């Protein structure tokens, strides 16, 4: 993950959870303060579901307007948490229509599902027919599961805003992320969402941003930056965010590499010695001592997107044959049958010592 300045163009598709407190502008301002650029547009009619967006001319026209870097998809706040029967009949087919529209525009666009938060006291209107949503935690768990299902189903990413909220509430339940209706976000909730989106889109921490709304104090802003960023960056693979990552195990001149990348289609390994591989988890043996720069490149979205991780491998194998010096008192040298013979090269000999130990040696012509 590089820290270079980036420019991303993003379309936000959602409803009031996105437009209250102008979430896209909050993300834009955080990015600007950290040297990055977010260009954005929105289609966020109040209360819109995925089904409504799937037939909304404005939404579909904006999807096709240009080759976006990301298109954020936020469902109506309750619908992904409802019963499996409802979700399968209403949410998933509409999400498929939106994904199809995105892919019809360009396979290079990355869909980014907006995992929202559970209502403060659960979903009272759906509690009786579907008890899992009776509480905040129950509703949050259903939202988490369904948004991740959709992300993995469509090889898309997920911005885990709801899980950042859960983490914040666990740390300090007195910081009210909700507005007075216990559903929509307060400015604290929207700022936390913005920090989470910044980390999801740019794959960089929002910690250190000099921007926060004037109604938030600096200590609280810093805490929300930490929570949003760590929720994303500590678990990129969990949220299916495209990322190149590797680990390795070295034994002498042989190195076994393990690919830990997420949401990728293919990988290319450059071992730094002129050799490459497209294997998932290759093992490579170096012919000479030296320090090698190994680059793993992960590729996705019809080869439009690439990410890389670089590690340094040092090989230092001694090739010298050293004379073994025995401080012990030598009694005799024998062949392998125990017959005493004078010292010879190129054949195995047994060295018998006064302390009763026996060593097998062979000395080679240099």
Task: Indicate residue ranges for each PLM-predicted region.
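Short, exposed coil/turn segments at beta-strand boundaries within extracellular/luminal domains
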Residues: 275-276, 301-308, 357-358
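Surface-exposed, flexible coil segments in extracellular/virion-facing regions
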Residues: 264-284
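Conserved SGNH/GDSL esterase-like catalytic core that processes O-acyl groups on lipids
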Residues: 7-11, 17-98, 107
């Amino acid at each position: 993950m590089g820290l270079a300045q980036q420019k991303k163009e993003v379309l936000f598709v959602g409803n009031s959870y996105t437009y209250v407190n102008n979430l896209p502008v909050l993300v834009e301002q955080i990015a600007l303060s950290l040297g990055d650029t977010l260009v954005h547009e929105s289609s966020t009619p109040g209360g819109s579901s995925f089904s409504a967006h799937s037939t909304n001319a404005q939404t579909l026209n904006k999807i096709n307007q240009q080759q976006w870097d990301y298109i954020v998809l936020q469902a109506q706040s309750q619908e992904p948490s409802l019963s499996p029967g409802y979700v399968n009949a209403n949410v998933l087919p509409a999400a498929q229509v939106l994904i199809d529209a995105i892919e019809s525009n360009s396979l290079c666009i990355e869909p980014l599902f907006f995992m929202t938060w559970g209502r403060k006291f659960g979903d009272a209107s759906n509690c009786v027919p579907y008890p899992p949503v009776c509480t905040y935690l129950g509703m949050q768990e259903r939202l988490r599961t369904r948004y991740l299902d959709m992300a993995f189903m469509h090889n898309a990413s997920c911005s885990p805003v709801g899980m950042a909220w859960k983490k914040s509430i666990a740390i300090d339940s007195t910081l009210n992320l909700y507005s007075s209706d216990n559903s929509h976000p307060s400015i604290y909730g929207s700022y936390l969402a913005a920090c989470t989106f910044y980390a999801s889109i740019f794959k960089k921490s929002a910690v250190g941003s000099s921007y926060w709304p004037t109604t938030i104090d600096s200590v609280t802003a810093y805490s929300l930056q930490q929570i949003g960023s760590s929720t994303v960056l500590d678990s990129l693979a969990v949220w299916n965010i495209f990322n190149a990552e590797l680990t390795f195990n070295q034994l002498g001149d042989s190195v076994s590499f393990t690919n830990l990348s997420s949401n990728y289609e293919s990988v290319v390994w450059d071992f730094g010695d002129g050799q490459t591989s497209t294997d998932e988890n290759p093992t490579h043996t170096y012919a000479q001592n030296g320090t090698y720069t190994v680059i793993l490149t992960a590729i996705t979205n019809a080869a439009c997107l690439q990410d890389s991780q670089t590690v340094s491998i040092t090989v230092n194998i001694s090739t010298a044959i050293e004379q073994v010096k025995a401080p012990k008192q030598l009694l005799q040298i024998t062949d392998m049958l125990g017959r005493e013979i004078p010292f010879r090269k190129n054949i195995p000999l047994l060295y018998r010592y006064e302390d009763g130990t026996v060593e097998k040696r062979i000395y080679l012509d240099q």
